[in-house]
Swiss-Prot record:
It is a multi-pass membrane protein. This is Transmembrane protein 225. Residues 1-8, 93-99, 161-230 are cytoplasmic. It comes from Mus musculus (Mouse). Interacts (via RVxF motif) with PPP1CC. Expressed in testis, epididymis and spermatozoa (at protein level). Not expressed in brain, heart, lung, liver, spleen, kidney and skeletal muscle. InterPro entries: TMEM225. It holds the Pfam family TM225. One of its GO terms (molecular function) is protein phosphatase 1 binding. A motif (RVxF) lies at residues 224-228. It comes from the Eukaryota. Residues 30-71, 121-139 are extracellular. Its main location: membrane. Keywords: Cytoplasmic vesicle, Membrane, Transmembrane, Transmembrane helix.
Length: 230
């Protein structure tokens, strides 16, 4: 089974959280989320849930909840990106609790943003029959769903990292290191020592002295001559 290294997961989380912040900032700058057509005048008016004021024909208090949730989501995403960056640079610990915290914040931010966009569409449908005739959704409104997907993906990766942290550290070994470890046993060779040379046989010549009466006289000290047979 193949496991993703921790550094790759953290790099992907930084990319996803940074992309979510970028999309939220783009949605904050762009003001034409929807195009409203009022009943009295036929002039088209653009609107965004980030705006601090609503059109004169649409009461402001009806969208205050949506605006607060969107701001809360932006703040959470900034803190989330900061925590992931500190974790990637080893400035905070990389234990299981930190991974679970980052995953919870990612899911919480995604759920908050999803709730905000659902409430905003509900307010649009409700105001269509009271304050304006029709509305048309622009392309910038669909970036919210991409932001939600980025938050959820970041949370899933954090939970995977918290559950498979030990397995990743155990099995995800670099290719060069594993190859060198496999080659170590094969390089060991048993070198046998040459057989111990046997000592050459020696031929000992004992010189005896013959006495005058013909008997062999073996003195106490005998003279010996050693000849090595090679």
């Amino acid at each position: 089974m193949m496991h993703i290294p921790n550094r790759s997961i953290q790099a992907a989380n930084i990319f996803f959280s940074s992309g979510a912040i970028l999309l939220l900032i783009v949605g904050l700058i762009m003001e034409d989320w929807v195009e409203l057509i009022p009943k009295v005048r036929k002039d088209k008016t653009t609107h965004s849930p980030w705006l601090g004021c609503c059109p004169p024909f649409w009461p402001e208090e009806s969208l205050e909840v949506v605006r607060r949730i969107m701001r809360m989501t932006l703040n959470i995403s900034i803190y989330l990106n900061l925590i992931i960056g500190l974790q990637f640079s080893y400035m905070i610990s990389q234990n299981k609790c930190v991974h679970l915290l980052v995953g919870f914040l990612s899911f919480f931010a995604g759920c908050l943003l999803f709730y905000a966009i659902i409430v905003y569409h509900h307010k649009l449908n409700k105001g269509q029959y009271v304050y304006f005739v029709n509305y048309k959704t622009k392309w910038i409104a669909f970036t919210v769903y991409l932001t939600i997907a980025l938050f959820l993906t970041c949370g899933i990766f954090c939970f995977i990292q918290s559950t498979n942290r030990c397995e990743c550290m155990k099995f995800c070994i670099p290719h060069t290191e594993s190859k060198s470890q496999e080659m170590i046993p094969s390089t060991i060779e048993v070198v046998s020592l040459p057989p111990r040379c046997a000592m050459p046989r020696s031929i000992v010549h004992v010189h005896s002295v013959t006495s005058k009466d013909g008997s062999l006289n073996r003195p106490h000290t005998q003279a010996r001559r050693v000849t090595w047979a090679l």
